[in-house]
Amino acid sequence: MNLIYLTMRFSLNEKNYFCYMRNIFLILLLPIYSISQSLYNPQLLYDNPGGIFDEDSLRSIYLDFYNPNYHNYLINSWYYNPSERIPAILTLNGNQLDSVAVRYKGNSTFCLPNDVQNVKVPYNIDMNYYIDDQQLLGYNKIKLANAWMDPTFLKQIISSNIYRKYLPTGESNLVKLYAQGNYVGLYVNDESIN
């Protein structure tokens, strides 16, 4: 018994004692730390998707215009008064926003598809143009690009992910767009940078 006491007395000098106590403390914290950790579960991405720019979910945006002749009106507005917007009801995941302001955007991405009478033109949607402080999942404005000449629909999303590693960059993802209840097509949803 005295031999064990002497061995501990000589081996536990002040420096060793500190290391010994630190290790005991860390061992005692290990169960607490382990309980607080969560395992990665990819199913959570589908059960609880993130914000409006979540790349792991394909959302559907429904635009219901008050003007049934909205397409021709927006085309004329694009040529004669490009900043003019018309009101519509936007629905996303059951959330409905009344009186969002919609206009067509783009130049070549607007003109070229429109030359072949394609209704898949790019959109600029402003949530708080008519109603102050109205937001869609925390955003005031979104831009829906038609990915003209990009059959993969990935150019904007991949470049955004690369740029984001080095620069402050807007987010992008894909959405399905319906106008007046009719499927218009797959769009690239770009964050509007003010």
Residue ranges and their predicted role:
Residues 1-4, 29:
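Selective for proline/serine-rich intrinsically disordered segments
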Residues 3-6, 12:
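Short hydrophobic targeting helices and cationic amphipathic motifs
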Residues 9-10, 32:
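Short, low-complexity, intrinsically disordered N-terminal modules
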Residues 15, 21-23:
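Positively charged n-region of N-terminal signal peptides that target proteins for export
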Residues 23-32:
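Sec-dependent N-terminal signal peptides
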Residues 37-194:
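Phosphate/dinucleotide-binding and metal-coordinating scaffold of catalytic cores
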